[in-house]
């Protein structure tokens, strides 16, 4: 299921977990390598496209009712 904005996420997994509405996992870096205080935050379109593109598609496919994705099926 998706994590609400402000909810805890695991910074050791990756930067883009299933945060609601295309959010991303934002952490503080301590000493350059320890991640702490990781929370789901709203990302700008640039951040979202850079780190969350593939993950958002996976989240949307696994739980479309709870995740909003920019990837809607295109009609040809």
UniProtKB/Swiss-Prot annotation:
Predominant location category: secreted
S-S bridge residues: 2-19, 9-25, 16-52, 18-40, 27-38, 59-67
Tissue occurrence: Expressed by the venom gland.
GO CC aspect terms: extracellular region; host cell presynaptic membrane
Highest taxon of the lineage: Eukaryota
Molecular function GO terms recorded: calcium channel regulator activity; toxin activity
PROSITE patterns membership: OMEGA_AGA_II_III
Keyword RNA-binding: no
Subcellular location: Secreted
Presence of keyword Secreted: yes
Assigned keywords, A-Z: Calcium channel impairing toxin, Disulfide bond, Ion channel impairing toxin, Knottin, Neurotoxin, Presynaptic neurotoxin, Secreted, Toxin, Voltage-gated calcium channel impairing toxin
Chain's role: Omega-agatoxins are antagonists of voltage-gated calcium channels. This toxin blocks calcium channels in insect central neurons but not at peripheral neuromuscular junctions. In vertebrates, it is broadly active against all high-threshold Cav1/CACNA1 channels and Cav2.2/CACNA1B channels.
Domain comment as written in the entry: The presence of a 'disulfide through disulfide knot' structurally defines this protein as a knottin.
Family: Belongs to the neurotoxin 04 (omega-agtx) family. 03 (type II/III omega-agtx) subfamily.
Miscellaneous comment: Negative results: does not inhibit Cav3 (T-type) channels.
Record-given protein name: Omega-agatoxin-Aa3b
Originating species: Agelenopsis aperta (North American funnel-web spider)
Organism placement in taxonomy: Eukaryota, Metazoa, Ecdysozoa, Arthropoda, Chelicerata
């Amino acid at each position: 299921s998706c994590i609400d904005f402000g909810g805890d996420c695991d910074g050791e997994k990756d930067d883009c977990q299933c945060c609601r509405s295309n959010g991303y996992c934002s952490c503080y870096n301590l000493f350059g390598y320890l991640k702490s205080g990781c929370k789901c935050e709203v990302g700008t379109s640039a951040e979202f496209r850079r780190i969350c593109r593939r993950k958002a598609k996976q989240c949307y496919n696994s739980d479309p009712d709870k995740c909003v994705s920019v990837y809607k099926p295109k009609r040809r």
